[in-house]
Design a protein with these regions (language model features):
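Active-site-proximal specificity loops/subdomain of glycosyltransferases
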Residues: 39-83, 91-92
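Short, acidic, metal-binding catalytic loop of nucleotide-sugar glycosyltransferases
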Residues: 21-29
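Conserved SAM-binding loop
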Residues: 34, 85
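Catalytic-site signature of metal-activated, phosphate-bearing donor transferases
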Residues: 62-66, 92-299
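A structural signal for isolated positions on well-ordered beta-strands in alpha/beta enzyme cores
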Residues: 4-6, 29-31, 50
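Active-site beta-to-alpha loop of glycosyltransferases that engages the nucleotide-sugar donor
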Residues: 2, 7-21, 36
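Boundary detector for helix-to-coil junctions that initiate low-complexity/charged tails
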Residues: 285-329
């Protein structure tokens, strides 16, 4: 059994060393897709890490993840595919845990992991001393895990919260498998203190990110008129914001307090590995950041998972160069 993780990252350097140290002990290979970061992450490539750089400003998570899965032929080369974000950490401690997880769901095509949101008190790089408070309650936001030994009919949607299942790339002709809830929580550290949230809001498109955060803020009862992002919020509101991060329905809001969080040192035994990855990250050169391009946006926004010929269009649209760059053809 072989497993891999695919991660699309824009900046978020504070997460990268801990993410790579944690997941390189779990899966056989990590596919790190650098999406127009201010430093070039291709030097992070190594024995268990593949790295590409997307030379595009357009925020197309699904398109770039699906292109990566297709380009690296992951559905044929790996039995278990985790498509996660740089702030998400699988709830396992070693490769044997991954094998046990796979064996538990050998007959399942799609498995669900639901966020267990957590927070750290300090900003800066995650490290072996980071004490993370994870909510014991799972949120209503799920991520999907693909058992490609059972199915190759999947195309990621919406940051991998959902998927399409076209038959032979035939668009509306779909065979939808029923996802199985693993009962496990995907450990999610959405921001590193309020300053980290401010940086995250600045890094991503307003309509794709900031507006969704603001909707969650309104649902948990923080006054819309309050300067919640720039100012200070109460400890209770902060914990409720963490637990309900990106929750968009009032009936799914978790009512939490300090007792609903447990403190975990997730990276306690990874100090040496985190330091090694941090050193490699510090050696990555600065990169030219692509600015918004209306023609690029118009072209890529036409590609939607599940449409007829979607993968063929992705192959025509995105091309690689010998240096590991990916750009529009």
């Amino acid at each position: 059994m072989k497993s891999c993780a695919v991660v699309l990252v824009r900046n978020s350097s504070e997460y990268i060393p801990a993410f790579l140290a944690h997941h390189s002990r779990l899966v056989d290979r990590i596919f790190l897709i650098d999406h127009n970061s201010s430093c070039d992450l291709r030097p992070m490539k190594g024995d268990r890490v593949e790295a590409k750089r997307l030379d595009a400003e357009y925020f197309g998570q699904a398109e770039f993840i699906n292109w990566s899965i297709d380009y690296f032929n992951l559905k044929c080369n790996y039995d278990l595919i985790f498509t996660i974000d740089i702030d998400e950490f699988l709830p396992f401690t070693g490769g044997d845990d991954i094998k046990e997880f796979f064996n538990n769901y050998t007959s399942s095509e799609i498995v669900e992991l639901y966020w267990r949101n957590g927070c750290v008190e300090e900003s800066g790089y995650l490290n072996e001393n980071s004490e993370i408070s994870f909510c014991r309650k799972r949120s209503s936001t799920r991520k999907l895990v693909y058992n490609s030994a059972r199915t190759k009919r999947f195309q990621v949607m919406m940051g991998n919260h959902n998927a399409k299942h076209p038959l032979f790339d035939l668009g509306p002709v779909q065979l939808r498998p029923r996802p199985h809830d693993s009962g496990l929580g995907l450990l999610h550290i959405p921001f590193l203190g309020m300053e980290g949230l401010r940086l995250k809001v600045a890094d991503f498109p307003k309509n794709d990110f900031a507006d969704k955060i603001r909707h969650s803020v309104n649902l948990i009862g923080i006054e819309p008129s309050s300067d919640w992002l720039e100012g200070e919020i109460s400890r209770r509101d902060y914990l409720r914001l963490v637990a309900n991060y990106r929750t968009n329905q009032i009936n799914r809001i978790l009512d939490v307090d300090e007792s609903d969080f447990e403190r975990v040192k997730l990276f306690a035994d990874l100090g040496t590995h985190i330091a090694e990855w941090r050193s490699r990250l510090n050696a990555c050169p600065a990169a030219e950041v692509r600015s918004a391009n209306p023609a690029e946006t118009a072209r890529l926004s036409q590609l939607k998972a599940g449409q007829f010929g979607y993968l063929r269009q992705l192959r025509k649209t995105l091309r690689t160069d010998p240096e590991g760059g990916v750009r529009l053809s």
